Amino acid sequence: MPSSTSNFDFCRVIPAHPWRGIAVLVALIAIAATIAWEVYVRSIGYAPTLNDTEDLWAETRRRVTPGSLVIVGDSRPHFDLDLDELERGLGSRPVQLSQGGSCAFPVFKDVIDDESFHGTIICSIVPLMWFAPGGPLVENAERAVKRQQTQTWAQWASHLLAVPLEERIAFLKMDELDTRGLLKQIPFRNRSNAQVGPALPPFFASIDRERRARMIEECAQPGPLQERVKNGWLPLFTPPPPPSFVPPEAFRARVGQAIEQRFHDTAALVEKLRKRGGKVVFVRFPVTGALKEHEDRLTPRQGPWDRVLRDSGAPGIHFEDHQELASFDCPEWSHLSAPDSVEFTRRLVPHLRTALQMNTTAAN
């Protein structure tokens, strides 16, 4: 029986408009706007490339087998190591797990904590990043590790659908050309309880399906983009001031304890892998210009680098120890150009073979 408040006789009248033509017009406007946006972003320097997402990292992490050659680190091995040259020189295709803007320790730990893994790790050490006690650098790596462990079917399917689109469409640049990225470009001043962090570098590299990063030519050559990337490094590599609500002495003590723990944990993980027959070689990749001066001042070589090697007993390759590695110039102070990365890797391979005792093994 109908309710007294219901009206079963109601009929919505659809206005007599040319709806099919309107739908076609809206579709054409959307297509035109999409094409215009794509043309515009390409005109300001963007190009189609994969986003280095947590899902892409998780996909790559799953390629690690018990005997794999794995690259772990920050953005420098991401840019500076050529996978083809490493495969040619070391005999196996490496798995690229480096991440830009991250502390590599959580990834280092994740790989070694896999009890089935007994392979080789090439690990980059940038002390200001490796010994970060917490914050975004550590959180970036932890999110990637967590995604690999908890990725849902929906996230996996979304990633598979996104890859062919990102390879062809320039404006699908996450964190820069999406709404969130564009909003981040609005300048805000620091406030007493809300400090604005340093700006991240703009688009200056391409990423392929194996997560091989290559500096784009516009950044490799002197110009506005190169200067913009350069000018961003010093603020990013300057530790933030202690929180105003924490006494400076207590803050320094807490950070000091975290750094000491990181030294201890690094050595323990190297030993853990060594007992399973695995190997680790630490590498200090080229850095030049004002950024090198800045890093040398804050973390002298005689400090963190030497101690990591001493505590862990692992071999290390420092670019400054070898003229053929030290002669490279980083266009934007922190990474090698795409052509230089190939030559650098070619020159690095003999040192890796020596550090990993591959020459001795081959001779026997």
Language-model segments: residues:
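N-terminal Lys/Arg-rich, disordered targeting/topogenic segments
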Residues: M1-W19
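Hydrophobic membrane-insertion alpha-helices, especially the h-region
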Residues: R20-Y40
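Alpha-helical transmembrane signal-anchor/signal-peptide segments
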Residues: R42-R62
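Short hydrophobic beta-strand that contains or immediately precedes a catalytic carboxylate
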Residues: L69-G73, L336
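Membrane-embedded segments
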Residues: V72, R76-L160
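Secreted/periplasmic serine-hydrolase-like ester/acetyl group-modifying domain
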Residues: N140-R276, A363
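Active-site segments of SGNH/GDSL-like serine hydrolases
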Residues: L269-R297
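C-terminal regions of proteins
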Residues: D296-N364
